[in-house]
């Protein structure tokens, strides 16, 4: 039977579309760990492809977390140290300093071989340069199909009279239909989607002390010392009236039995890159869906004397910051992320948007609500988003 030409063309295109892209190693997730893994594979002479669902590499390293929790820096080596050494070389150039003089930045020392604080955009530029030098192929904007995106091969082998079943990923499929096969797959994403869909067991939430015979797991109210209210703040919608209900953001239930596990995970926030350089400062935006009532608890806390808004406001080069949560009420959107780890993409996007609205709204509130004390408001108005950071996302971090 002779098939019509258009049918043959369709079959040919279908075959091409369904064929997998083959590499020795596929790395899923362009976090800093994923970047390092892909570079190392390439340096070992193996073929590799790095798949990143967003349009950026670096994860939180290029997403605002410029204050490296480095501990004992003498033990940091390999590609990680190479990254920090390249940053040091960058900031050794006069042209790297635009909003301040190099000698005015206390965390840069010419005698050091590495620098541990950096601007988000410089982090991503550095990581992209390292990928390019290693000739790593990077695919952006491809997400794993969470329904049927992992194909497995199961085999039974016998050794010493004992049978053992092994499972291996043979291919992964993106939402776009793109397929990738490899001898080895590395999940370097924060969510662990590839790991989870491959059947690896994991835990979400807090494990109980009894799970592994430990003492610091689960509910730990007795050890809660940081980020606690240091003044009595009325929690009710109508002050003094329990019948009026709790203010937004409060949980009225019992925290749970000490040492018991639950579904709760550590709070999320965006690590904000702020600046007080007028020529590079963008005013805090008012988010769509802004509700000042969401910050009523904070206002009451402020009126009790709280003023340490910038308690975790770390200086980066060029008068920028890595601004993190500090205190009982801050940039963490506490309790609003429990569905994120096991959520589908729509659920996660909703949660991320809620966090963005909450965090943007917090700073809009502090800068613009007339009830905020003037001394505090004037200090916060000196700051804003950095105009030259996250330029494709309204100067807002692309990674939560």
Regions found by a protein language model. Give the residues of each.
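Bacterial N-terminal signal peptides
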Residues: 6-15
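Beta1/beta-strand and adjacent pyrophosphate-binding region of the FAD-binding site
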Residues: 21-31
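Second-shell loop/turn segments in exported
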Residues: 26, 69-72, 111-118, 181, ...
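N-terminal Rossmann-fold NAD(P) dinucleotide-binding loop
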Residues: 34
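Aromatic pocket-lining residues of Rossmann-like dinucleotide-binding sites
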Residues: 41
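Flavin (FAD/FMN)-binding glycine-rich loop and adjacent Rossmann-like elements that form
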Residues: 163-170, 177-184, 188-400
